[in-house]
Amino acid sequence: MTDPESTAIDSVAAMATDHTEAPAHPLHKVLSFVRRSGRLDDRLQRAWDNYAGTYLLDIAAGNLLDVREGVTLDRALVESAWGNDNPLIVEIGTGQGENVVAAAAAHPETNFLALEVYDPGVAHTLLLAGKQGLTNIRVAQVNAPELFKVTAPGTAAEVWTFFPDPWPKKKHHKRRIVQEAMAGDIHRALAADGVWRIATDIEDYALHVHEVMDGLDGWKNLGSVTVSLPLEHVGKGNADLAADMPHADFTESERFEGRVLTNFEKKGLAAGRVIHDFTYQAVALH
């Protein structure tokens, strides 16, 4: 990949080693997920038992999804947990782990951190990584916004957020992972010229991404594809109304070549949904 919107994983910039003090966690957090049952079938339980000790990053606060007090994700932690100082790519919402494990297998020179809150997804990611004997991937079962609040500047080369929970009800849009505050924390966490890659198959979420990111200081949209989107949001079950709304052109990216076609994405395509890809590069704040 040689075009700017498909920055090659192989050539990610070197990261800084600055440390920042972890801010106090708010008493009332807006979560981007709903805690569901963590029951595992026998196969996934065996995977957890066999591979958690190898791949699961011990940064959670007990059985909670909070980040343990005093934890800072920085280059020192990367070197300790991965055993090297290679560039780090963080995937938010790993799901079943298909994409991040495939990326880790294809790029042994890069470290990968998979963030997932649901037990079955964590276990399946452990299973895929363990079966291949990968050494460059770790998994953390924590709330991603909290982790990025305690991530030191320049720690990550890239951040990936593929097919996040769309939270279709308008009253729940504040729970969407793409928010100004999250963008600010990711901007700080990225190395110079690092990128945040986002993908969604929900048109209303694509509009949300543009509203949050396109005018935000410190970010450059590297896209080259023009798409037409409605200028108003629709609520859950009202997606058909979007066709009659005023539309405008927006700039998005070609499909990221480093993202494998997961079962989730296949289902979206089979349902006739359009995939929206975004590549935002962190640039100097004005």
Swiss-Prot record:
PROSITE patterns: SAM_MT_TRMB (PS51625). Pfam families: Methyltransf_4. The active site is at residue 165. It catalyses: guanosine(46) in tRNA + S-adenosyl-L-methionine = N(7)-methylguanosine(46) in tRNA + S-adenosyl-L-homocysteine. Substrate binds at residues 169, 201, 262-265. It is an enzyme of class 2 (transferase). Gene3D superfamilies: Vaccinia Virus protein VP39. GO terms for molecular function: tRNA (guanine(46)-N7)-methyltransferase activity. S-adenosyl-L-methionine binds at residues 91, 116, 143, 165. Catalyzes the formation of N(7)-methylguanine at position 46 (m7G46) in tRNA. This is tRNA (guanine-N(7)-)-methyltransferase. It comes from Bifidobacterium longum subsp. infantis (strain ATCC 15697 / DSM 20088 / JCM 1222 / NCTC 11817 / S12). The gene is trmB.
